[in-house]
Amino acid sequence: MDTIVWTVALMAAVGLVGSVLLLIVSRKLAIGEDERLTYLMSILPGVNCGACGHPGCEQYAKAMMNGAPPNACTTGGDRVAQALAAYLGVESTGVVQREAFVACQGSLDHIDPQLVFKGVPSCRVFSTLSYSSLSCPFGCLGYGDCAEACPFDAVVVENGVARIDTAACTGCGTCAKICPRGIISMVDQASSPTASVVTCKNTMAGAKTRKVCSVGCIGCQKCAKTCPTQSITVENNLARIDTDTCIGCGTCIEVCPTHAISKLVFQ
């Protein structure tokens, strides 16, 4: 009987000691994880723009602790990527430069307003109510939701159209996500420091486009026929440029009769 009691007591003591040791180790590991997270957070910009594909900087830091690559922060650029890689002890391949551009040039100089909207000055509200203040149903509404949302003040509205300050743009994509008409796009830099982009989203036939906007794409295919790298196709009356293969030569810009193609310079 005594043997059984002592055996049970010994097992209980071993279990207690083991539990205490596990608690101590887990707390030390937790402290270590907290320290890593804090340090990674100190390197990141802390603007929570979501360009990395995560809701915020903390979530990205946690993802890196679980193996995510350190080069997803376009806001921080190569400097932040290298610092993160050095701390994590991994190799950084550098950050792919990304720029936003507005696929619309329909300012008040090129398009006629159809009505005056007297309400909340918001693109989202205006779009939800299905109003069309412009003769072009694809154009920028110009109420500046994108400018208000940009954490870097890289978007301004000039003469009724949003414009991106490429020097201030970090490629976070906040403006593109909030635009109700989807006319703001993100372009990743390929081999060339410049790329040609179509600054129009109008898919109406060329004759109809000419009636509503003087700088809209009319689908004439001149750009596609002259592109030396065959980077341009015309689908549904709208030219589309593959920026991965575009070398930024500008040939398409020169031949476009409505000046609906512009050069995008990566900063």
Identify what each model region corresponds to.
Residues D2-T226, Q230, V255, H259-S262, ...:
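Ferredoxin-type iron-sulfur electron-transfer modules and their immediate structural context
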Residues A162, L238-A239:
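Hydrophobic residues embedded in beta-strands of well-ordered beta-sheets
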Residues T229-L238:
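Cys/His-clustered metal-coordination modules, chiefly Zn-binding fingers
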Residues G250:
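Basic, amphipathic alpha-helical segments enriched in Lys/Arg and hydrophobic/aromatic residues
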